[in-house]
Amino acid sequence: MTFSSTGSVRTPVLDVAYEYTGEPGGVPVVLLHGFPYDVRAFDDAAAVLADRGAFVLAPYLRGFGPTRFRDATTPRSGQQAGLAQDLLDFLDALGLDDAVLAGYDWGGRAACLVAALRPGRARGLVTVDGYNVQDIAASGEPAPPDVERTFWYQYYFHSERGRRGLERNREELCELLWRTWSPTWAGASVAFPASAPSLHNPDFVDVVIHSYRHRYGLAEGDPRYQELEDLIAAQPPIPVPTVVLESGADGVGGPLDPQEREHFTGAYEHRLLPGIGHNVPQEAPEAFADAVLSLL
């Protein structure tokens, strides 16, 4: 662990746990992890950023680690609009007008959405997954078979068998995803135990299952996020300065679609990372940190 401190802030829906390092007077940088990861993914990159004067914060997403829902009756939604609103609420709770946003997987999606829908809150964006915004209306369209097979876990989670499998075997299943999504990363199995406790959040299973059903139109969303979902459905452009990091050896999904470039209307840079898998900040912390530093 290289973050120097831990904290918690209350938002309308969550008590958000986070870790931070660096001087509070530095440029704020919010690092956003994905599924099935946690803030440990940023330990090395955060140290580099703090040494360069940034104030680095890494929240645990809803359903992960010490972050908790405030109300037992709140739907345990994993929908993308909820993640985006959580990020906006996190910035508000800390009194941050804006920040450089950097993330991957679920966290990259939250960062992309805030950069698109509330560009004044994002000084810049680092997104590992390109235009990481779900197009739910088109979710019924098949991908090429070689890509579809990498989504087996998503289709598994559509069934009650998959829910039970995640509940009973969460560490085994998620460690398998770590290894298969980062096939060239020899340290995946060694690094996994440090993040495994975050998968035992009491809401982890509900949030994950809802996320992978909602994105395919198989589950209703939380009504409080419907206005945001309506805006997201238009696939809004991202006008803020952006660095896209593309994994050269990602074991889930396929290569970035060149047509995604049209979604970025501000300053833009694409960086290919040969031999790097899905968990970019943990596999290539210097490259990840360098992308963030280019936006400070």
Whereabouts are the PLM-identified features?
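An N-terminal hydrophobic leader/cap segment in hydrolases
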Residues: 1-8
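A short loop-to-beta-strand scaffold at the N-terminal edge of the catalytic core in hydrolase folds
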Residues: 11-20
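C-terminal alpha-helix
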Residues: 94, 291-295
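Conserved acidic functional residues
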Residues: 34, 105, 282-283
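Flexible "cap/lid" subdomain of the alpha/beta-hydrolase fold that forms the substrate-access gate
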Residues: 2, 15-16, 28, 64-98, ...
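Catalytic histidine-centered segment of alpha/beta-hydrolase-like enzymes
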Residues: 276-284
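Conserved HGGG/HGGXW glycine-rich cap/lid loop of the alpha/beta-hydrolase fold
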Residues: 19-69, 90
